[in-house]
Amino acid sequence: MSAAMRERFDRFLHEKNCMTDLLAKLEAKTGVNRSFIALGVIGLVALYLVFGYGASLLCNLIGFGYPAYISIKAIESPNKEDDTQWLTYWVVYGVFSIAEFFSDIFLSWFPFYYMLKCGFLLWCMAPSPSNGAELLYKRIIRPFFLKHESQMDSVVKDLKDKAKETADAITKEAKKATVNLLGEEKKST
């Protein structure tokens, strides 16, 4: 690791949160530097993502669990800048999930797929202003959306109208069935 990256990594490992508190306890009990403990855990997770059973679940927990937790904290904070950061992540995560749905049957056979996917998701959620989610959103998703916004709005409106019509028809039929059922009960008593 370069000196600057190592210093940044060490600073990150000394920030106050539940994970660094756990690392501090492990460091105190074992006498092993928390950087080495963290790198060991990262190495074990990487190996598990390559060879472990349920690597897909672990990868999805990493890509979903932490961002969901931080998103809730962002919603509850008065700062709206972090809301935008995590909304951007979720847009990229959604687009990635849709693309992955169609390609997963082929990609999951590659031995390093889940490790690469996990690395991609970590890059997207990295705590930096130029993380992967921001980059992908600004360079790919936003231009595509702005180019096709009116067509997408039209499709969404049509789907919404059809869903409302269907819900209204089902409600009307349910009311008729209820009235008929109540009418038959009155006749039988």
UniProtKB/Swiss-Prot annotation:
InterPro entries: TB2_DP1_HVA22. GO terms for cellular component: endoplasmic reticulum; endoplasmic reticulum tubular network; sarcoplasmic reticulum membrane. It comes from the Eukaryota. Keywords: Endoplasmic reticulum, Membrane, Sarcoplasmic reticulum, Transmembrane, Transmembrane helix. Residues 1-34, 75-84, 124-189 are cytoplasmic. Its main location: endoplasmic reticulum. It is found in: Endoplasmic reticulum membrane; Sarcoplasmic reticulum membrane. It holds the Pfam family TB2_DP1_HVA22. Expressed in heart (at protein level). Expressed in circumvallate papillae and testis. Residues 52-53, 104-105 are lumenal. The keyword Transmembrane applies. The chain crosses the membrane at residues 35-51, 54-74, 85-103, 106-123. One of its GO terms (biological process) is endoplasmic reticulum membrane organization. Residues 114-185 are annotated as: Required for dimerization and maintaining endoplasmic reticulum morphology. Monomer. Homodimer; maybe disulfide-linked. Homotrimer. Interacts with ATL1. Interacts with ATL2. Interacts with ATL3. Interacts with CKAP4. Interacts with RTN4 (isoforms A and B). Interacts with ZFYVE27. Plays an essential role in heart function and development by regulating the organization and function of the sarcoplasmic reticulum in cardiomyocytes. This is Receptor expression-enhancing protein 5. It comes from Homo sapiens (Human).
